[in-house]
Each structure stands twice: as C-alpha cells, then as structure tokens.
Amino acid sequence: MQDDLDGIVRHRRRSLSFLQIVTLTMAGLVAFDPAQVLAGHPTTDSELQTAGSPRPPGLEHCVDQEERRVARRLLYISTLDGRLSALDIAKSGKLRWSVPTGPGPLISSSIHRLELTNNGQFVRMIPSLSGGIYKFDGDSIDPIPITAEHLLSSSAKFSDDLVISGGKETRSYGVSVRTGQLLYECSLNGCVNSTEEGLAIDDTIREPDEEDQLEDGEQLRDEAGYIVRHDPLLDDVIIVRRQTQTVRAVESRTGVERWNFSVGQHELDLVRPSECQLQPRDELELAVLDVDIKVVVPEGIICAFSKSEPQTMLWKYKFDHPIVSAWNTNADDELQPIDLFSSAQWLWDQDENDTELPNAPQSPPSIYLGMYDKQLYIQESIRLRQEIMDQTKVYQQLTGDTSLMPRIPWKPISASSKSLVIFRKDQEDPEMIAEGAVAQGGELVPYDDENFAVAAQSVLNASEFVNGNGFYFYTTGDLNGPQECSTQNNPTDLPAITAPTSPTNATSEGTEATGNHSVNDDLGFSLDDIDAPVKVVILSLWFWWKEIVVIAFTSAVILNIFMGQRNQRVEREYLVIERHVPVQTAIEATEASTQALLGPVVPMQRPGNRFSFPPGQANQRTISESTTHSGEHYTSRFQSDFELMQCLGRGGFGVVFEAKNKLDENRYAIKRITLPNKESSRQRVLREARTLASCEHHNIVRYFHSWTETPPTGWQEEEDRKLLAHELSTSIQIETPDDSTMPSLTEQLKEKRQQQLLSWVSDAANSTACSHDFHLPGESSLKNIREEYDYDEEEDSLIEFRSESQSAALRAEEEDDTDDDYEEDEEQQGDHEKRHRSSVSIDIHSASFDLKNINYSQHQLVSNSFQIESVRPKSSGSDDANDDNKARRKPLTLALAQNHNNNQNGSQPTPSSATILNGTVAKPSKVYLYIQMQLCRKESLRDWLRDNRSETRAAHIGDIFHQIVDAVDYVHLKGLIHRDLKPSNIFFSQDGQIKIGDFGLVTDMADIPNLVAKCGDQSGLPSCARHTQQVGTHLYMSPEQLLGQHYDYKVDIYSLGLIFFELHVYFSTEMERIKTLRSLRDGQYPKDFAVNYPQQYDLLQQMLSAQPEQRPQTKQLKSQLRNILQLPHLLSEGQSEQAELAERARRLSRSRTFSSSSEPHQ
C-alpha cells in the first residue's frame, strides 16, 4: 500500500513539473512580440517606451470575428470642413465612414482681411488652427505673442473703443469604429445619447448581389442579414474631441463687428474593451503595418506606399477639402499621429540616385500656409508651436528679449502635387499623384525671385491665385543651422527654398538678428491699432517732407498753367467782338414793348431773300463776327463706327436710327438727343441714358453704350439735309429755310404745303403745349387754342411764349390744317380775312436776356432760346392793310444780341455784343447725346392693336399684358416712375418678346415735390412741360397729373388700365379710339363691355380710379391677372426657356397681320 502511495506522489510531482515547464514556455511566447520580426524593421524609441509600460490584465483571444478588430487597419483623417473620416488601408483606401463635428468648418475668419499699415507697408493678419496669430508683410511671416486665450483674458491691451468677446468650446463625440455610428455627443448643453432605438443605425435587409458578395467582410451581419449593432463590450470606440476657439472684436459704441476668427482642431483617442487586450494579428493586419502614409495637404490627397518598396504606390484617395490631421494604429494597437510635414521631404527622398535632383533637406518644414474658401490659415509643426508658447510666456513676463521669437522668411515650397516628382513603378511607366498633371524629366519645379514676389503679393492681397493652394516654410534657424554644422545637409540647396542673397543683405540680416528690439518692433505695429481696418503710422510730419515739396510744386505749376490758359481763353472771347449794336431791352413782352424794340413791322421789299430795313434805320450800324468753325476735319464717331441703315422715327427727346456696327456687324437702335445748355435741363435729358443703364430686365429695352458729340455749327444740319434727301420722296421739299435765305411772304403762302421738314429731323424736344382738349385729326390746333382761351375777334393782341420746338410744332399743325381746309378757306375767304393775323417771332437767347416777372426756372428747354410771337387781329379797313397783313402772316425771325442790359425807363439802349454775319445768327455748337440700345421691331404695340381684331388678340392678351406689368413692377422696385406708358412706347423684340422703351420722362420717386402748380396757371407759360412732374401723353396721363397735384407711382397703374382696356376693344378708326378713351376717363364704358368682360370691368374700375390710393400695386395686379387672364405659369417639365420664347414668337408672328395681310379698316 505504501509503495502505491509513493508511486502516486511521484507521478503527481512529474505532472506538476511538466505543467510548470509548459506554463513558462507559454509565458515566454506571449511576452515575445512576433510583429516586430515579421514587419522587418527595428524597434523605435516610442515602441520601446510602449513595450515597457504595464498592460492591463485581460482575457486572451476573447474576440474571434475579424470585423471586431477593424480598428487595426483604419486610417483616420480630419479635414478642414470639420469632418472625421475613416479609410480602410487593407481595402485600397476605401472610405469606411465619415461623421461631421460641430459647430462647422475648422476655420472661419475675417481677420485675414484686416489690413494694417506699418510705415506705408501693408501687414496681413493670419490665424492658425491652434489659436495663434501671425503677421505677414510680404517679406516674412512672424508669429505674434498673442493667442486666442490672451485676447479673451487680457482686454486691457486694446483701445477703449473695442470690445473682445468669444470663448473656447470643447465638444466630445463617441463613434463606433466598426459601424461609424455616432454613439453620443457632449457639449455645453449636455450629452445626447444616440444609441436609442429611434436614433440607431438603419439596418435593412437587401437582396444579395455581386457587390454584397464582394463586401462580405465590410460589415458584420447576423444570420438574418442585419448589420450587427454596436456592442460596447466588444467593439472599439473612437473618442473625438473638437476644440473650437472663437474671438470677435466689436466697436464698443455701435456694436459693429470689426473682425473675427474661429479655429478648431481634432484630438482622437481609441478605447478598446478592457477584457480583450492580447489579441494576435493575422497576415492582413501585419501587412497593414508595412504601409507608409503620405499626405498632400492642400489637395486632400492620401497616398499609401510600401515601406519595403518605397517607389511603389499602393493606392490613393482624394478628399474634397484640405487635410488637417491624420492618425493610424501602431503595433501596440495605440493611435499615433502622422506627421504631415514629413511629406515635404518625402518628395525628394523617392529618388536619391537621380543626379539631377538636389539634396533634400534633413529637417521637416516649420509651418504650412494655406487658403480655404478665400480664408488664409496656418498650421504649425509641434516643435514650432512649443517654441512659440515658450517665447510667449517670456514676452508676457517682459523679462526677455522679444527678438528670440522664431522668424520665418518668405521662401515658400509648394505643397501642391502639380509640382511634385514623378513616381515610377518602372522606368517606362510614369505615374503622377494628381490626374492631368505633367512633369518633365522628374525634376522639381523650382521657384525663383519672380515667383516669390508673385506668390507674396497674392497672399498679401488674398487673391484667387493662392485659393486652394498651400506652401511650406522653414524658420531662419532651420535655414542657418545646418550651415554651421555641415554644408552637405544644407536644406537651402533646394531652389524652392533659397534665393541668392548679396553680402549686403547678409550683413543687414546679421545686424538685425543681433540688435535690440522693442515690443512694437517685434510686432511691427502697436496693439492699440489692431482694431482699425487701415491705419498709417507716422512718427513726424517731416518724414514726408519730400512728398510735400513735390506735391506743392506740382500743384503750383498746374494751377499756374490752368489760370494762364483760362485768361487766354477769356481774352480770345473778347477779341472776336468787333462792334456793338444798340438793342432795346424789354421789361414785359407786350405789343408796345415789341414795337419799341423793333419798330413798325413792314414786309420785306428787297429781293434775293435778304433782309430789308426801313429807310429810317439805314443809319444803323451793322456788325460782323466770324464764329463759324470749319467742319472739313471733323469726324463723327457715329459715322465712323456705324453704318446708317434707316431712320426709325422720333423717340423720347430725339431721333432714332437703325445702324449697323462696323465691327461686330450687329444692328442697333441709336437715339440722338440734343443736350440743352442749361445744366439742370441737361441732367434731366441724361436721365434716360442713366435709367436704361441701371435697368437689367428681359422686358425692358437693353442698353449698350452712350457718348456725346459736339460737331461744328451747321455741320449736323447739313448731314440731316443729306439724310432727308435720301429718305424722303422728291415730292416733298426737304430743304430747311434758314434766316439768310428767307423767301418772300407771298411765295411762302403759295408753297406752304411743300416747305415742311419732318418733326423728327430736328433734335428739339416734343411739343408739350398745355391743353386739356386733345387735338383730333382734321381739327385746327390754332382753333383749339383760340377756343380754350376764349379769344375774341376784337381782341387787340395775343403774345405766346413758346420754345422753338413748340413754335415749330404749332406752325406745322397750322400748315397741316390749312392744307386740309384749303378749299374751304377759299370759299370763306371773306370771313377768314377778318381773322388773319400777322406775327413777329423774336428769337431771344435765354442765357442772355431776362424778362421780369416771368419764371422760367422750371421750364425744361431743349433749345437755348424761346420766341415771342405778337399775334394781332386783322382789321377790315383797307385793301392795303389786308395785303400788308397777308404779307406778315409768316413770322420774321431776328436774333437779338447776347448779354443785354435791362432798361426800365425806355431811354437810349446800351450797346451789347452780337454775332450777326450777312443777316444770319451765329449760334453756338450743339452737343448731341447718342444712346446705343437694342434694336426691336419697327412695329409697336399700337400697330399690333390696329392690325389685329379682338378675336385675334384673345389668345395673346394675357401673355402681352403680363410682360408689361412685369416690366413696370421692376421699374417701381427700383424706385422709378415711367410716366409715359402708352402702346407706342411698347415694342416687340426680334423673337416676339415685349420690350418697354422711351424712358425720356422717367423720374425718381424721391425727386417729386409735395406740391406742384396746375397746368396752365398764371406763371407765364401755359405748358405742362414747365414741370418735369407734368409730362407724358395727355390721353394716358392720370387725373392728378393733369390737375398738377402730387402723385406717385400709381400714375403708371392708371396708364396700364387704359392699355389693358385697349387690348380688349378693337377700334376701326383713330377718331373712335380717342373718343372712346376720353369717355373711359370719365367713367363711361362701351355698351356690353361690363357684360362681356365682367372680371376685367371690376379690375378696370380699380385701375382707373380717380383716387390713387384705390389703384392696386403691381404685385396685387399680377395676382389678380393670374386669375382673370389665366397667365402662363412655370415652364413645363423638360421645356427650356428658349423653347418657350420661340413658341411665343411664333404665336405673335401668326397673329400679326400688318398692311399686306390685314383686313381693310372701316
């Protein structure tokens, strides 16, 4: 028994010894790290430090699924837009997941636009992502010993009118490494857990396909096909810490923000299950350790290379935003950051055997300067950031020399792949990192001094040249340090880093480095001036003594030359005056003053179209002055740049031509307007060009260009005669009788119908004679005026004050009426002889003649003169008197001298200057304004209404009126009033689109006074045109305009109502149109209109209301028209705007039936 027990004991002892040996062997295998042997690289200091640290106890091999250990092969990337992304290194860099972080991008700044001035040199402020501030003056980038924390805590350093606000915010995120699910988010407001059922990742079952079969290892799924949810006990978690620093500077009085910047950075930490620590790596995970990651920061490119074969690129991935940071796991399953600045050396380390490449620098760059979304920012290396923090502490204590702050000269190295070296798998297969980039010979793209200056100026001005690009920089210590130790490892051998320096520069740099610097010298500007956008630092006024002397001397010389030329011009003006002529001045324009001024009016007796004075005036002296300018060498820009095609007629205040540009061969509408000499009147005429230039709407005539011309006197008139000879038929006399070739009065009466010049030839303003009665065709304008003012046959005289254009227009109307009633006048000659009137027209220059008690300041004159016409009734005394009055029916025109003196007592007149040569008046040269506009069809909306009946218009009324209202709405939104809306001012473009033109009467709403005089008051001018507020076509003017009351933009609504009515009603004759519209203004609608158009009738009641406040606005009008006329809505799906315009043009073309195809009018 004893022997059996002893045998059992010995057996147990052997078993325990064997178990102990096995345990020791296993412990040795576990302590030995096979990854270092398989990876084939020596152990680094960080790995030794990590290996020496104690590991927490845990279970071995607790997780068998490969996807649970996916953190070992992921690459974490932080981009500038604030997102954190994960790339699978083993899956050719495929994007595993990407999560955003708040509150937004890592950079949001306006401080880079803050321009400070240091002794006349601009200084640009650039923030860094770590919270620091740098200043750049074009020569160097210098750190400022101020951070965001200092700005928020030390407000006493700034001026009293600046308040600093902001803060530092930290947000933490928990992200599942395997699924990319956002587990929680913690901020100042608390933590939000996203693992509830409603916020969990959306797991759906999809039909298995080839893509799913290829990505079986992409996500861990259960038997039912669902993605396995995050397990906090088994899955790894990435802790993302987002630190954001925000600083805002605002004015203490107004609260206006001067500048701001907000920067942020990401910090990552990997949390693994505490029970699963000692897990072996498989072959795929061991291969991941052999991958070297390189980064192209500005382009967001990640490149993976093999450590064993550095020239072989495994894969590449490109982000849409620049890269800020990158992390991966090491052999100890711990996160380690990737040095982005080592990528600058990596480019030159790829091909060390190439003799053409210079030696690469041995130290990484210090900072990176980039631009993102037009915002400059800086990233520092860890070494430089620590050095700046140490020097900042010294600066705050004021115990050290501030010159020890690191200085970074402007010697950039491009960080873009467009200047990288070619990487080759073999000698015949070049491959670039950036697609589309081209390299030659495998060499670096060097920077020279010119490229340095261009890049520096672009950064200083924050231009688009550097937007999306980036540069690396070295500090002065990095550039100078290797020269003292070893010249072979000098990084300045690279052409992209150094530039040749002269011995003088070297000496000055050495002096600067060893000299003493103050705080302001180190900063380059005072801290009190950082709040100002632009400030100039001037130590003394004597600093600019050279500039002051040059400016004073130059100003004296220019002033002396200008005054000398002005005196010479004045002398030349007086030298042309040869003689004086006595002229009687008038206080009031009456018949007595006219006779005293001119003497008895007698018919001309001298043949040959010359003036004949009475014998009593034979002793009067005559003067002669040559003021004519030769037009032989004058060149008109209109004639040199354009080829005249035809005259389109009158528009606004001038003549409209169709002309083809000789350069682009396109046809345009050119409007020519004569500018008045009076400055206020000239500005009102220029208003049309300025209004067209400021309007950009598809239903308003397009404006291209404008210019002015000042031809010699008589040159433009001669060109107009040539034009008329070409345009008009030979049956019409086109020659304009002037003052020197005036025919006899008897011949004028016989040839009155043939000696007409079309009103649109002269560039005078439209006739705006005031009359509440509209002149109908066939009625005499002279009869209307006589009836309006209740003229009596026994009245002695009538004196009318009109501009030249008004007199010309009135005479043209009289002549037209005389032609129509010629036969009737012959039958009733006895009656008409009693009413024959003789008139004397006196052309007085408004610039030099003054009539008291007459206010002409508000009269808008296109010409610089007006006429006094003395109209006397005909007496039936004798035949001689009848003949005399017949002869005086055509007015004589005499030009009085300029600069008359008032003679109230009627004594001997004082001599004045005159410019008369051979009986003609020498007028000053006219200034013409040319406006180049879009060429529309010659037919206007008035022609379209005349040639299309109501049934033909029905399909187009809504489309046409909608475009008109849309254009008027745009004009009102710009604060303007058209004031002359009528069918003749609405045109069609070449593609049939509505175009509103003729902005000659447009005005600003703010320019209208609260009170205007009524039309035809007692101020001396019976014309509505005396006020710019009382203009436009009378038939379409609102009641408040006609009554001279205050008005606003509602006058255009009234005109739109009349146009809207015309679109629905067809008029067979012009007489019917005018009578119907005049009745409509009085509230009388045509019979059956309210029955046929009930909705239109209700709308017109509002638009034509006598009370402006009852008229709708354009927005309300468009809303009502949409329901009434069924206006076109948005374009149908798949139909382009061009197709819609083409269809509209075809519809309008089919509806237009002009004279060749229209029905005969009744």
UniProtKB/Swiss-Prot annotation:
Tell me yes or no: is Transmembrane helix among this UniProt entry's keywords: yes
Q: What induces it?
A: By ER stress.
**Segments traversing the membrane:** 538-558
- Primary location class: endoplasmic reticulum
Q: Which reaction is catalysed here?
A: L-seryl-[protein] + ATP = O-phospho-L-seryl-[protein] + ADP + H(+); L-threonyl-[protein] + ATP = O-phospho-L-threonyl-[protein] + ADP + H(+)
Residues recorded as binding ATP, renumbered to this chain, are 648-656, 671
Give me the stretches of Acidic residues compositional bias.
Answer: 813-828
| Keywords in alphabetical order | ATP-binding, Endoplasmic reticulum, Glycoprotein, Kinase, Membrane, Nucleotide-binding, Phosphoprotein, Serine/threonine-protein kinase, Signal, Stress response, Transferase, Translation regulation, Transmembrane, Transmembrane helix, Unfolded protein response
> What enzyme class is recorded for this protein?
transferase
How this chain assembles, per its entry, is: Forms dimers with HSPA5/BIP in resting cells. Oligomerizes in ER-stressed cells.
The record's function comment reads:
Phosphorylates the alpha subunit of eukaryotic translation-initiation factor 2 (EIF2), leading to its inactivation and thus to a rapid reduction of translational initiation and repression of global protein synthesis.
Designated name of the protein: Eukaryotic translation initiation factor 2-alpha kinase
Q: Which organism is it from?
A: Drosophila melanogaster
